[in-house]
Design a protein with these regions (language model features):
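Asp-based, Mg2+/Mn2+-dependent phosphohydrolase catalytic module
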Residues: 60, 74-182
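Alpha-helical structural context
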Residues: 28-29, 65, 85, 115
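Conserved donor sugar-nucleotide recognition element shared by glycan-biosynthetic enzymes
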Residues: 18, 51, 105
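Short histidine/acidic/glycine/proline-rich micro-motifs that form metal-
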Residues: 9, 46, 99
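Substrate-recognition element of Asp-dependent hydrolases with the DxDx(T/V) motif
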Residues: 34-85, 93-96
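Residue-level preference for long, well-ordered alpha-helices that form the structural scaffold
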Residues: 11-14, 51, 125
Length: 182
């Protein structure tokens, strides 16, 4: 993404960035010999991610009272396939692909509000990434942090401390649904 932001690359969707990274890693570690079909299948593992245990049920509860919108750096086909595979009950998929900016760029959040015909102050960014929440907050969104202890794997400790600027802090999606009455 930094190469796109710096102008080294034109706008590039995440699937293509993932493929560039994969190709570079395979070359770096001398892991050749995969067919193009195998490389494509490996690169598309992102399309087949399993959901976190609280995601499907918690999002379904939120959906009973609110629109559940995915706002991601992932391209639309990746997010659509992920939702289908994991059973994620999103109402709408908004992608950095449609804004031609990646998250943490203010244009992504402004584009989301525009696509939903909602004023910024009626939008809430729900995420396990503080940087994403901070960027959305700077644009005018409300924020809800959902703690995800394994977000970066079992051997890393994520920063899950509550920050004063967060509007809501939840232990998981079910806790968030409880807090907002869903």
């Amino acid at each position: 993404m930094n190469r796109v932001r710096s102008g080294d690359l034109p706008w590039t969707k995440i699937d293509d960035l993932h493929r560039m990274i994969l190709d570079g890693l395979l070359e770096e570690y001398g892991l050749g010999g995969l067919s193009e079909a195998e490389l494509d299948d490996l690169n598309r593992v992102w399309h087949r991610l399993d959901p976190w245990p609280d995601s499907v049920g918690g999002l379904a509860r939120l959906k009973s009272s609110y629109s559940v919108v995915a706002l991601s750096n992932g391209n639309v086909s990746l997010l659509s396939n992920m939702a289908r595979h994991a059973g994620l009950p999103w109402d709408i998929i908004l992608s950095a692909e449609t804004a031609k900016h990646y998250k943490r760029d203010r244009e992504v959040y402004e584009h989301a509000a525009e696509m939903l015909s909602e004023p910024l102050e009626r939008m809430m960014m729900v995420a396990a990434h503080k940087g994403d929440l901070e960027a959305a907050r700077e644009v005018g969104f409300k924020t809800a942090f959902v703690r995800c202890l394994l977000e970066h794997g079992p051997d890393r400790t994520p920063d899950v401390e509550r920050e004063e600027w967060m509007d809501l802090y939840a232990l998981d999606f079910h806790d968030l649904a409880d807090q907002i009455g869903c």
